[in-house]
Amino acid sequence: MAENRGNLTSYRPDIKVMDCTLRDGGLVNNFEFTDEFVKDLYEANVAAGVDYMEFGYKADKDIFDEKEFGKWKFCKEEDIRAIVGENDTPLKISVMADVGRTNMKRDIPPKSESVVDMVRVATYINTIPAAIEMANYCSDMGYEVTVNIMAISTAGENELDLALELLASQSKAQYIYLVDSYGSLYPEQVRRLADKYIKIAEKYGKSVGIHAHNNQQLAFANTIEACSIGVSLLDATVSGMGRGAGNCYSELLLGFLRNPKFNIVPVLKFIEKHMVPLKASGVVWGCDVQYMLTGQTNQHPRTAIAFTKAERTDYAKFYTEITGDE
């Protein structure tokens, strides 16, 4: 993988883009997307040359009530097929499985029975053994697999080193993900972490991906910084739609990448048709002061999300609440 390192303007044919609009964006609107929205997003991604499209979660119906969420919280096979048919396109279909929140043996069929190509296993650093078990199960079922270690900004250096070595050496995942869950990392930190991930991953023939959040308006900067180091699977969402402050903007990333296979125009047309009216309807996401503050203090954005829902604007008081500082 060392040969894939370069600078911000290097042409990298190994780079792949993952659209996470439905999955991360679903955390904003409870996964209540219309079929037209999903179908048009799928077609836009195909036309734009995007490599993977994440449809949502494989959530356990015994834990989450189907009546309380849109269908992309559960990603049933028939619902995906209603959008993509047999998916006779270069675009690959992905779903996310949360450790402890997915019944993998019941809800993840053999690849031969599914139009899904990739399962992304989401884990915290203290559940790595369970993530390895899930990753290996999905690999044995015939899927491409990633393992996404969340909230790494709160992990100790030795703890992270041990987790990465264990994951890289014992899992059958093709990708290990650097995830800035709190949007607290800066490009210099991302560069150091990406270098660490790559050095461990490449020992075992694996690659590295990145999933960034935009609390400090650094999701794009952090994504391309990781890319310049050699990270090759890049997550993005249309209009940055995602939990709280959102994610790296697809349109920013596609416009930046030096690869003629990518075409930004289909994404721009999708924004015109769907994202502008979605925001106008009152669906809220994106960087704001409260998300900036949780990012700067390396905290989960749940307090900022509650602040937003309450339509508060007392930012100084909020800062005191989350830090204890007057």
In which residue ranges do the predicted regions lie?
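Catalytic cores and adjacent flexible loops of soluble metabolic enzymes
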Residues: 1-326
